[in-house]
């Protein structure tokens, strides 16, 4: 059996991006039985024709106890590397005879395999990004703040026909470039500063 909880992985498998926050959302795969089921808060209705059977849980429920009823009492179970400890620890209480393993490598490996269409999208996004970098470099010495430079990049992406950012860009000058996850601010660059442009498009 395998529990998948990462919203990006569930989106990959179901084609629907949902962010449950602190609430339970898991896909349970029972490979031996050939069954898959979604266990999710009732705040996220799946419509009349969900891909797989759905069990809804309420905030007042012991949602992991409900989940545990779908899981064997013995054997090996793969757990999503991103599953919150509060859920995992409760499941370990309810199913102490299971052997728990990191099961994320299964979905991670599957997601690495790209269709021809997906490969074409990635190649095109890379091409557009290369063009955007060429144009953005010419804007670096014009006195824009880091935030303004990011705004300029979005204009460039749209002008090139891109949908926009694949992630919010990091545009930083000088000392800010030493922070690998810097949040763009109102800093401006000066002659001799290092510049980092960590960007990507869709």
For the regions a language model picked out, list residue spans one by one.
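Generic preference for hydrophobic
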Residues: 38, 54, 100, 170-171
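Flexible, acidic/His-enriched mid-domain "rim/lid" segments that flank
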Residues: 62-165
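Short catalytic-site patches enriched in acidic/histidine residues
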Residues: 10-20, 104-107, 144-202
């Amino acid at each position: 059996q395998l529990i998948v909880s990462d919203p990006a992985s569930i989106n990959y498998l179901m084609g629907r991006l949902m962010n449950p926050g602190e609430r339970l959302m898991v896909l349970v795969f029972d490979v031996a039985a050939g069954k898959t089921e979604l266990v999710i808060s009732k705040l996220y209705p799946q419509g009349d024709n969900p891909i797989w059977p759905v069990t809804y849980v309420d905030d007042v429920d012991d949602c992991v106890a409900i989940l545990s009823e779908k899981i064997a009492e013995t054997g090996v179970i793969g757990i999503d590397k991103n599953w919150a400890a509060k859920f995992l620890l409760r499941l370990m209480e309810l199913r102490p005879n299971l052997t728990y393993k990191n099961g994320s490598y299964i979905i991670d490996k599957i997601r690495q395999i790209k269709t021809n269409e997906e490969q074409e999208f990635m190649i095109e996004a890379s091409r557009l990004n290369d063009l955007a970098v060429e144009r953005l470099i010419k804007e670096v010495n014009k006195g824009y703040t880091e935030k303004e430079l990011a705004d300029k990049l979005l204009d460039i992406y749209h002008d090139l026909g891109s949908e926009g950012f694949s992630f919010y860009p990091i545009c930083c000058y000088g000392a800010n470039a030493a922070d690998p996850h810097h949040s763009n601010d109102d800093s401006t660059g000066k002659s001799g500063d290092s510049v980092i442009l960590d960007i990507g498009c869709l």
